[in-house]
């Protein structure tokens, strides 16, 4: 059975990941793609108020389950668009440990902080300051196959460029490089060191 392809969008809250994912489902005409978003997994959790230690445990388990759900979908041949926020190093390491590196197109979704703040205030469904808190964390591993800036390109434009890049995904993907750096080469650079430049969108 041929494994499915994974388009992995990583960026802060309000950076435009979900909008790009929706456009990707519309423009991708080679295969059947599914949009898996970490926010949707969080929304499935019980609504009762949890103690801080309960919430921390629940969130970690939710994200670990999310990562393994991505892997399970792709393993049986489903193509997947992933919408995630890698704001903690362990999330990236866990994804590297469960996803096949050669199947992942890793896309960095960027947006200037002032625009993120404006979007966050306009949407009104996110805690104030969430994007600012995540801003210096989500991209610190520094290596992608492709990057886009949603302040200069529309979600549709980003999706079209991702679609165009997908057939040209190099054999040694960003996930392969990161896997070697963090899970194989124990003497290599730290999790937040910069890697080689990726294609710019």
Give the positions of each predicted feature:
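Loop/turn-to-beta-strand initiation segments
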Residues: 76-81, 103-105
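Small-molecule kinase domains that catalyze NTP-dependent phosphoryl transfer to phosphate-bearing small molecules
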Residues: 118-195
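Conserved substrate/cofactor phosphate-moiety recognition/catalytic segment
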Residues: 22-71
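Conserved phosphate-donor/acceptor-positioning beta-strand/loop module used by diverse small-molecule
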Residues: 99-119, 148
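Hydrophobic anchor at the beta1->P-loop junction of P-loop NTPases
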Residues: 9
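Conserved lysine of the Walker
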Residues: 17
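Walker A (P-loop) phosphate-binding loop of P-loop NTPases
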Residues: 14
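Pre-Walker A (Motif I) flank of P-loop NTPase domains
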Residues: 2-6, 78
């Amino acid at each position: 059975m041929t494994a499915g392809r994974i388009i992995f969008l990583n960026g802060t809250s309000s950076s435009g990941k979900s909008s790009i994912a929706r456009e990707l489902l519309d423009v991708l005409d080679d295969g059947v793609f599914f949009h898996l978003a970490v926010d949707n997994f969080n929304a499935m959790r019980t609504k009762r108020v949890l103690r801080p230690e309960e919430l921390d445990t629940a969130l970690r388990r939710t994200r670990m389950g999310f990562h393994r759900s991505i892997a399970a979908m792709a393993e049986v041949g489903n193509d997947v668009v992933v919408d995630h926020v890698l704001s903690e190093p362990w999330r990236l390491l866990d994804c590297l440990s469960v996803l096949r590196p050669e199947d992942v197109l890793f896309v960095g979704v960027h947006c200037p902080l002032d625009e993120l703040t404006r979007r966050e205030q306009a949407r009104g469904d996110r805690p104030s300051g969430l994007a600012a808190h995540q801003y210096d964390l989500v991209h610190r591993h520094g290596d992608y196959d492709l990057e886009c800036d949603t302040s200069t390109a529309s979600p549709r434009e980003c999706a079209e460029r991702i679609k165009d890049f997908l057939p040209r995904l190099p054999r040694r993907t960003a996930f392969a490089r990161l896997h070697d750096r963090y899970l194989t080469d124990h003497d290599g650079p730290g999790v937040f060191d910069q890697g080689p430049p990726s294609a710019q969108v």
